[in-house]
Amino acid sequence: MARLVGVDLPRDKRLEVALTYIYGIGRTRALETLAATGISPDLRVRDLTDDDLLKLREWIEANYRVEGDLRREVAADIRRKIEIGCYQGIRHRRGLPVRGQRTHTNARTRKGPRKTVAGKKKPGKK
């Protein structure tokens, strides 16, 4: 199992897919990285040489913010928005959707499970 920027890459996957296991690297960045380092995206992780791993590690560390650094940066951005009291910060503080999505219905992921209020039944037909 190859280890890159603190992440174990799955041995049997193609390199293009395996790189997406690193937080901050998606399909596009994976292909970009492989093109820049001259490594074939069709290679499997188990077929990588130590030189290839070194090339990948150096390229990623030099050009992208990934894993812990990126997570810290995102958390700091959210904290800053909460502190300055902007609209997005208020939405984060209240645990509601931040980017303008509707909340009358849906938004269950952000709002959590429903909290039913007693005595709010709709009258039935007679």
Swiss-Prot record:
This is Small ribosomal subunit protein uS13. The keyword Ribosomal protein applies. GO terms for molecular function: rRNA binding; structural constituent of ribosome; tRNA binding. It comes from Acidothermus cellulolyticus (strain ATCC 43068 / DSM 8971 / 11B). InterPro entries: Rbsml_uS13_C, Ribosomal_uS13, Ribosomal_uS13-like_H2TH, Ribosomal_uS13_bac-type, Ribosomal_uS13_CS. Part of the 30S ribosomal subunit. Forms a loose heterodimer with protein S19. Forms two bridges to the 50S subunit in the 70S ribosome. GO terms for biological process: translation. SUPFAM superfamilies: S13-like H2TH domain (SSF46946). One of its GO terms (cellular component) is cytosol. Residues 95-126 are annotated as: Disordered. Located at the top of the head of the 30S subunit, it contacts several helices of the 16S rRNA. In the 70S ribosome it contacts the 23S rRNA (bridge B1a) and protein L5 of the 50S subunit (bridge B1b), connecting the 2 subunits; these bridges are implicated in subunit movement. Contacts the tRNAs in the A and P-sites. PROSITE patterns: RIBOSOMAL_S13_1, RIBOSOMAL_S13_2. Belongs to the universal ribosomal protein uS13 family. Keywords: Ribonucleoprotein, Ribosomal protein, RNA-binding, rRNA-binding, tRNA-binding.
